[in-house]
Amino acid sequence: MVKVKPVQNGRTTRMSFSHINEVIGMPNLIEIQKNSYNWFLEEGLHEVFHDIAAIEDYTGNLVLEFVDYRLDKNPKYSIKECKERDATYAAPLYVTARLFNKQTGEVKEQEIFMGDFPLMTDAGTFISNGAERAIVSQLVRSPGVFYGSSKDRTGKDLFTATMNPNRGAWLEYETDSSDVYYVRIDKNRKLPVTTLLRALGLSTDEQIKQFFGDSEPKINASLEKDITHNTEEGLLEVYRKLRPGEPPTVENSRAHLNNLFFDPRRYDLARFGRYKMNNKLSLTRRIAGYKAAEDIIAPLTGELLAAKGEKINMAKAEEIDNAGVTRVTILVEKKGEEPRPFIVISNGCVNAQNFFSFDVEAEAGVNERANFAEIRKILDTTSDVEEQKELLRQNHDVLISRTVTVDDIFASVNYLLGLDHGIGTTDEIDHLGNRRVRSVGELLQNQFRIGFSRMERVIRERMTLQNQENGEITPQSLVNIPVSYTHLTVP
């Protein structure tokens, strides 16, 4: 006699004729789509509005802020009606906008209709012009810093590195057979890496050698190739490579470099990129198994963490890393050569929980490795627990930077130098650990971000025109329906 048993698959009950019980039940295959879309509604849209912050006119007199948003819970048509009428299943999106006139001190606040927002069905699809469509998730390269290697004709190892964000300009490092390290900024013409180091603050040859080590042959070779000699010349040379044909000035170059890498509106590592960056550039895995070339002292307490000549195990390396130590000199050995010192430099991020008595993730929202210099400022400012919590919340974006930092760039160059000595590892970029799924919520967020950046330019121009006409300026007149709908419509 055939035994039939009921099997629950989501909301559906099916009858199974199998003799062997299932080990794992059928997963909810549309859960990823629905969870991603819900994240976009609850957090993704908020991040887009937060990135915009305030829109100022060219004179700095008028400021438009997006305070809040809400989605109407009652769509115009049901799913069935949308299919019958060839309509789009959507709900109105309303945004509360506040206009501040600095000259008169007048504040106007209005709720503005920004267009129809596409809604997801229970099946994880969208209804567009009566047709049911699904947004396919993308498998993309994860943001972070990744290292590779190749060999030249003589069999010499040539190391490369790529620092790619979720959104923004790329940094690509490469070396040639003459031991010169080059860098490409945003896929432009290459220049010696020391030129970029000068532009970021290491002005003289002595400062660069002192920071990375006097006896690093690739730093010395890059310095010989470098035609600049100080920070100003470095900034001008970087600007010439990025903007050929334009007259370079120190101010323009500094502003352009800041916009490329340190402006959150133009550069974004995202949370996963920051995690990968911190994990790669930390000290722990790079100093474990080596002997300390000098005493290692905790910067906050003055405690001796490792004595000169002591071999550092993994537990000790993790303790050193989380104590806020950013530079460790270790001894590296090569066959037939005497041990020589090598400076290992981290990006200065630590586990914040080690420095506070309360749960920093639950009570202050610090859920990633945080910048040690900022933690130290907070500890020096106050010892009161409640004040520390408040300062952690206020400085969250500085503690966990979504952009690349100068320390990240310095540490990435140091990691590249260490590969020559067998310190660190190269990455397999096709490994799934270095890939991530970009699902529907993030794709929608990126589309809205593009739309808002276009709309921002139109609003700024409208501010200037209406200000010159001396007419009544309201948030509604600046953000009218045709403008917002044209730029925010998701294709």
Residue ranges and their predicted role:
Residues 1-488:
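N-terminal non-catalytic structural scaffold regions of very large proteins
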